[in-house]
Amino acid sequence: MAAATRYMLDTNMASYIVRGSGPALAARLVAVPMAQLCVSSVTEGELLYGLARRPSATALHTVVQEFLRRLDVLAWDSAAARRYGALRAALEAAGTPLGNLDTLIAAHALSVGAILVTNDRAFARVPALVVENWGAS
């Protein structure tokens, strides 16, 4: 039996979900089993940074914490680090670097064989990374 496809939500998609997604994104979320959804611990860090900048937004804190509780948050590991080193060097050599956090997330998705769900077109520059935009643009 083949392993189920994993979908890693980028920070922008996670933010859209937390803020209340549009109909296309909501439809995709309903169609995909929760066990197939994940975020990188890098995305978790970005979401928590956003909360730290808005300590009085208690409703947002509750929503983000619940979102993170329901999804698999994949820990950054040595496999992701090895992929990051090679990916960053390749992107820089090609003259097409990504931002540091985006490179970390792309490397993490590649290291676990996940499809990256994002609307950031810059990820198309990453060789071998499968990207899907679930309609939140």
Predicted regions and their residues:
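Short, well-structured N-terminal submotif of metal-dependent ribonuclease cores
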Residues: 1-39, 49-66, 137
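Active-site neighborhoods of divalent-metal-dependent phosphate/nucleic-acid chemistry enzymes
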Residues: 2-3, 72-117
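Acidic, metal-binding active-site segment of PIN/NYN-like and related structure-specific nucleases
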Residues: 6, 105-137
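A secondary-structure boundary/capping signal
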Residues: 9-11, 40-43, 119, 127
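Generic structural signal for small/hydrophobic residues in well-ordered secondary structure
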Residues: 10-11, 25, 47, 84, ...
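Alpha-helix capping/helix-boundary segments
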Residues: 13-14, 43, 80, 105, ...
